[in-house]
Amino acid sequence: MKKILLSIFFVVFLLIGSECELIDTPPGYYNLKKIDKFQQFSKIQIERNNKTIYSSSFHDLFYPDICEGTIQNIPGSLYFGRSSFPGAQESSNLMITRGTKMKYRVGNGGIPIYKINVLCIEGTLEIPEGISFFNVGALFILPGGVLNSKSSIRFTDLDPYNSKMDPFNFFPGMMVLGGSLSLIGEKKRIFQATRIDDYQLQIEDFKKIGSLTNNIYLGSKVTIYSQQISEGQTCSFSFGASNDKINLTSSSSSSLRGTNCLPISKNDKNIIVHFNCKYLLGGSSESFIDSTSTVGSSIYITGDSQVQIENFTLDSIGKTTNKLYNDTKLIFSNDKPNQVIDIIKGENQRFRNSLYIEFSNSVVIKGCAIIDRVKESRAPLIFVSSNVSLSESLIVSKSGSNLIAQYGTEFIKSKLNHYFLIPPLPQPFGLNSPINFPSPFSMDYGFEGNGIYSLSPNVQSINDTFISQLIALNFNFIGNRSIITGFDNDCYSPCTNTSILFSNLIQYPVDFKINNSTYFYKLNNNNNDNNNNTNNFNLLNINNENNNNDDNNNNNNSQNHYLLNINNNGNSPGRFFTIKDLVASDTVSAYLPNSALVFNNLNATENFSFNGTVSRLDFINSSFNTNLTSTQKFFDETTTTVTNFQNTYIYGSPETTEPPEKVFGSSITPIYYFSKSVLDSLKVETVYPNEPHKMFFNSSVSLSVKLNNMGLKTPIICIFSSNGMESKEVQYNPISTKCSFLYVSEKLGNHNIRVTIKNEYSKDSSYYFIIDFPIITVYGQSLFNAGWQMIDPTSTTIIPTPTPTSTSTSTSTSTPTTTNNNQLVNDNNNKINELDGLKFQGGCIKTLGCQLSSNAKYVGGLPNVTASSTLNSLFSWGITSDVQYDPVIIDLFINKSIATLQVQLFFTFYKPIDQYSSPLSVSIQKNPVLVMEPFAGDQPFSKNLTFVYNNTQSLDFLNISFTSRGDIYLTSLAIFSVSDSLPQIIDPITPTLLPIESVKASKPAILAIVLSIVLGSLALSIITILIVKHRKRLSQFLSKSNKDIEYAQNNEIEIKVLPKITSHSSYPSISILDTISSDSIFNNQIPKNNNRYKFKNQSLNNNNYFNNNNNNNNSNNNNSNNIIYSNCNSNYSNSNSNNNNNNNNSNSNNNSNSNSNININSNSNSNSNSNSNGNNNYQIYSNKLESFKIDEISNDTIPIINSTFPDEFQTLEFQKLAFEILKREKRLDFSFRTTNDILTCCALSDFKDFSNFPLRFNQSIITFGLINGKAKLGETYYDTLSITNDSTIRFTAFLILPMDNHSATFTSDHSSFDLGPGETFSIKFSITLHCTTRFFENFSIQINSNNIKEMYTLLKIKVESESSTRLDFNDIHFQELIEKYSWEILYRGTVGDKNALLKLIKLKTKNCEEAYRELNIISRLKHQNILPLIGCVISKDYLCLAFEYPPLGSLDYIISKKKLKMSITQKIRILIDVAKGCKFLQQSSIIQKTLRARNIFLYDTNENAEVCAKVLDLTSSKTIKGLACNNYIERVDTPINLTREISIIRDPKQNNDFNNSNNSNNNNNNNNNNNNNNNNNSNNSNNSSSLKYNIHSFAVLSYELLIDEILVGDTRKFGQEKPSIGLDKIDPNIKNFIHKCWNPIDGFTFNEILKTLKDFIESLN
């Protein structure tokens, strides 16, 4: 017999822990009790017009005091009979008292079951199988009461002589107020059948039952449901020759329906059979609940009740109809607040349904038939704020909905259910009808004819079947519902200032979970095969506004049928709606003018098309496999602002699938394919550019399409075409698997480029793919027109700006306290500076040219988001909306005579509201130019957006607005005019978006833009391309010495010579830079890197322009083997100058033969005195040549962030914590080395595309023979490059290698060589990888001759390492500080693109070996409940460990911040995972010293998930052997609650065993068998000593989780009294379990703990 559920694990908030108010009523009525159902939730006090408004109608529960005056049982009674209740008569009112356990039986004085009027249960009643009916008028389960029934229950009318009136119409029926209800039927009654013929069905499940089928279902009748008979028909039947077939009794007369059957339609694909044994005396009885009451009955469950209903039938017991709710109203006395003087009884009381459940976290309904077809009800099932699992059930109703999921019901799981609906008749809903426009106060929803009506998007529908509904799944989102619920963290609709709700900023994206559900509907009720229509995910309606805007939206008055309807209820702003894995074969319609709709993995087939209105429409990883004609288009009826295709294939011609109108922000890159078979052999992997691209006049961009050829043998060509160029054929390169084309911008304006990929030999119009690239916009040079730095004019902060002059453009800023006459922002006097007649303004001052909406909020102290201190100063202030999603509006003065303007905006993303993306929208002159662009990330970053506006109306002011959630800040704004001397722009678009990704800071116009903002300089910044003069031949310098070197070139790079670097670092660590002046080797040779630049590759196709100004380079070099590089254009990010004079004086004193100087000029003013002792081994070092980069934090600094939880994220602070990678052996080569930036700069083209390059190479990519393999760490690989001179000229060649770094060592056996005509020279390369890395680098070869200028080419190295735990420190990023201990620091951060838990351990003499040993241990820990180690980096002073970081964070965070409301089942499931992890550690001889909530991390709260929680071993653990050998425990943050366990480990009686075991291990290193034996002996010794290391900690953890509180102070100590607070409200078995674990000596082992917890789970299920 199944174990009886005895307990309630959560705090019961009804009646227990709070007193109920007693309400007196007029004579004839039951007195009432009043409680606040929402008292466990925080109240939301809303004020409007200085009045507090609050609706208590839904919060307050009034229920009749029906148990008053009942007859209580005799204490200790075991059986439910007349003798157990003294004085009980027929129709008595009875009470089973608390602590009494009774079993129902008839006879021996038992009360007849049809004579119970009222039964109240505080104890336990068990009704066994075999009872025909348990008749009762009112069944009331009070807090703590338990009813377990395997027999049927029938509700009857209340005895008028022994009852009063119930004003709220709960009874007749059942009310459960915080108790436990278990209704378990023994036999399955619902089966899916297959039609064989008109009167024969096959039931596959009967094959499993076999010959017992006849006995189980003997004498039954069947009720058959299908899409043609959604109301069902009851038939007699007999078994066929085989037990899996049933024969129906036929009749030609429909009047015999109910005893015989009409034929089954051949079009019925979904047939459900319900074996109905309800009224039969023979055969197996059915377990059901029904009603004979003349006024109806209902089941009302609340108060965190435990509910389990299986294999039961609920037959037509609901009361609430599908008309307007009409609730009972109480008229209270003015003098006595608890006295009701009159009652207006409601005619249609809400929530009196077949089954209404609220505030219950453990509800299981399985295999049930819920029938509600007597009258039009609102819904047979309604759930509010509950966790419900509904599966394998049949729900049949003549109602507004089969199921309504109200507020807070976020965890409903509907799986394998069959929903049949007789749609309601059209209601006379007019424009003024409240049912047509649901009020949030009435919750009058779900009347339309739905399968599932939900106010929560998290309702899951998996493999469900919906029959005959008007809308299978109807989702409604209401922004002001918290006024009713009181949920302080419940805001699925946007929370705006126009909503009633203010308390919560969280805006969840909506991700619908609809997997493989099926929808069938019929056009009418005529049983005609031709009238049946089957839709499998094929009609979708999404609505964003109330129905009063369009009468046609009223689904009750139309024959439209939808699988999914989404109504955003007119809320603005909108949100992201995501639909995954949808298969659509017909029209999809949406009306979401304020929202974004994303289809992910859409499979569009047959007649699919999309129509409606959405703000943003995205198709991701989708395919359109439809047969389109020239007149049929996907988007004929679509209105959208932005349309995005990402990796999406469309079958058909592009001319038939043109997307609708869109702003420039649209990413239109669909992939059209001609033949469905082509996808089996050829696919498109990547397209570049894959987003709108910006470029400047006469510049170039490399267009490319990468293909995945899976067996296509024919040659492929790619034809590039555009409105701005002639078509160009490009041969597909099978080696790079790309088609690449260098596109040169020769016209201004917007260019639509298309590539057609086809068979080279095909002469017809057939093709493989046609791809439209995103729009490419070509701009010209610009003049600064107006700007605005977002600093609060009321602030006392002064942003200084240096004086702009014609001879200096230094970007360094003055100190914050400096003032000068040319300061752009001076908030003391609100001064506006005019330079050359142009204005630059700080703050917004109406009288001086700009206006700002009053809702703008100034925010200072924004974090550094670039590598430039100047830009960081500029971006330190920003504005955002004071109310989220409220647009910030800016009116800025412009010159109306200028026709074309460029508008540049800088935004900083900082302190995200939650873990979801934050959308940004931008409009210019109220026209959208950026729509709901998602910003997301854990770290602050900056984004530059540049737009084009054509001022055709000659406006004086430009209106710019943006909206966000309040976590995106506009930090600066500038407007530029396009030069009139440039050609006319073609195809203007107003306005036009230009994202930052396409902006190259090295371009002259961007320099003008950024530096004009930074310096406030309004002077002309036209960047000219300087003509580079020919330098003297290199041979002249090699043959001469001690002679001044003259430079006539303007654009050159200074590359300084350094001694060969022998550490892993590719650039100096902070510790080196900060002490550079005291280092004689590095003195005056390493340029100061104040901005902490990181190295980054630059595009090969980008031409960099730079103007030097007054560069005086005095170099005294005493070096050898020096070379001069020239003709190399480059640029520093924060420099801009006009070259006037360039005097370079170099004096060289050489102490060796054949000496020459290396001195390549740069833009920086520098005096370099280089002294060396004649060492021939040098490498080249350069300053970083890059523009500022988003999220630039140097790898040699680690952030210290004073934050524990994500929602307490504070301003970044940085600590100079040098992380110097360990040194390795010196290189043997003496190569010239520099960074990839200089290599890219110097190499003017790839040799394969440079037809004039005279050298030929045997390979272009050095792979070291690892094309299809990966390199092992620490192993050296070799490769040879053969170079052949195909010309008639002798060349001198120089090899320039990339800089060494800690991830790899790359060397060559030669640094230079001579190569005569026809000669071949070989260079041997070697590489050694030191960590998990992808060493994809470039190296350059420069050749020189007496007859021609020097030439460059670029080759590549591509080597990837095998996976390991040794990480590349450049991939590790530190974010927020979690904990700091005496010798270790714990961070949250990332490793690559993965979230990680990062731990720094100080490596000192006393614990260095300890750390290595623990690293070795942790790397071997592989268990699903142990937080896995990603890898590590070892430096000179630190060991950095990276662990996997789970998505839900730590248990401590969830408990302390009340982030999740978990059921008892979920909590026990988490404890099981923790126990599994601890058991594994114990078996591995590891003591987890930090077992507490902060070291338990959650992955999932679904109790059916494979893994819910993992234990983090913070490497404070010690092996047992290590503890005994060292005979001490490092007490670093040792938890207080482990004191007792440590004393057990230190037990002297055990030390000898440990020491002997360890000594034995140490003395037998040469004998593996002895070692193994000794290890086993040690483990046996450990087991025999019964050390229960973490039991007490586990008890504390369990206690904290169950009571939802984190213990502090002495309450955690071992030796304290066993806990009692909160335990009196949970199951006594759980309480005993915690008490037993509280003492680790007498407690369980983890094996026993797991068994106990699994027993708890089994009892709950």
UniProtKB/Swiss-Prot annotation:
Disruption phenotype: Cells overexpress discoidin and initiate multicellular development prematurely.
Membrane topology: Single-pass type I membrane protein
Signal peptide: 1-20
Function statement: Regulates the transition between growth and differentiation.
Chief subcellular location: membrane
Family, similarity comment: In the N-terminal section; belongs to the GDT family. In the C-terminal section; belongs to the protein kinase superfamily. TKL Ser/Thr protein kinase family.
Residues in the Extracellular compartment per record: 21-1007
Transmembrane segments: 1008-1028
GO molecular function, one term: ATP binding
Residues annotated as domain Protein kinase: 1372-1661
Subcellular compartments: Membrane
Name the record gives this protein: Probable inactive serine/threonine-protein kinase gdt1
Annotated region described as Disordered, given as residue ranges: 802-827, 1089-1175, 1547-1584
Cytoplasmic side: 1029-1661
UniProt: ATP binding residues: 1378-1386, 1399
